[in-house]
Amino acid sequence: VFATYVHDFDPVIFEIAWGIALRWYGLAYLAGFLGGYVLLKRLAERKLWVLEPAKTADFIAAAALLGVFIGGRLGYVFFYQIPRDGLDSVLHNPLGIFKVWQGGMASHGGILGLMIFTFFYAKKHKVSWTGLGDGLCVVAPLGLMCGRLANFINGELYGRIAHGLPWAVKFPSAFGDSKAPESGQLHSAFQAALEADPGMLNSDRIDDKFQILTEANRESDAVNQAIEPFLEPRHPSQLYEGLLEGGVLLAILWIVRIKFPKAPNGLLTGLFFGLYATFRIFCEQFREPDVAWVIDGVLTKGQFLSIFMYVFAAAFLGHAYKTYKRSKASAA
């Protein structure tokens, strides 16, 4: 019996051929986009969004490519990869920027990308930018939730060490993180796994050991039981973020949109920025920082970036308030 659940999800659902595989990560994004399309079309049909229902599919497709993928990937590269691995990691492998199927997407980058995309889309199609953004912000948490579930399945972006937490999870992927205490236990864990499953491949190379061990962990209960003592129990922070930044935020914004159909443009966008920043800052205290702290032991990179979202929240809420006051004055 394990003291704590040892993460053993396989990020690959099944392999097709020639190294091409269907991954949970890609499926999560697809589910988010399809779900967003369904919800946005419903809002459009109820006249609660500035676009016509027939334009919803094209808008979602363009937003996915130009906003989420490009913005999210560039955000990861500039906010996380370069500060962690240095500029040379990009200069020596520039094509790696486009390998989104390997993971590495920043939600702050995706949000910024969507802001830029919707601004130019609104100008081209002569619709309200804030009205366009309001609809997108209502459904965006669904995509965020799907992304966090994929992070959990991949065993990435795991939480901080949490001894005594009943629902803690042990992540074998921590063996490959040089900053994690588990990395110093890789050799011992590998030897224990070999004894538990002699049929497992052997290797003297550190990189090979990590890959072999994590693959065996997904297939062998004996290996899981053998490596469990060498892993630290951690917060499943991906699930916390999925619940708050995804499920709770989606419910709040959807209720506001339905209950207040004549809410001024910008209100929902402002609420999204403010609530997302609050939930993200809260959840970051349970998440293992991806890169160096902005302020040691006090402020993570995710929290630092989220602080700026309050500025956007204030701007959009201020715009909504002014719009509301003008409409009241003109109706008087």
Tell me what each language-model feature is.
Residues 1-332:
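Hydrophobic, membrane-interfacing alpha helices
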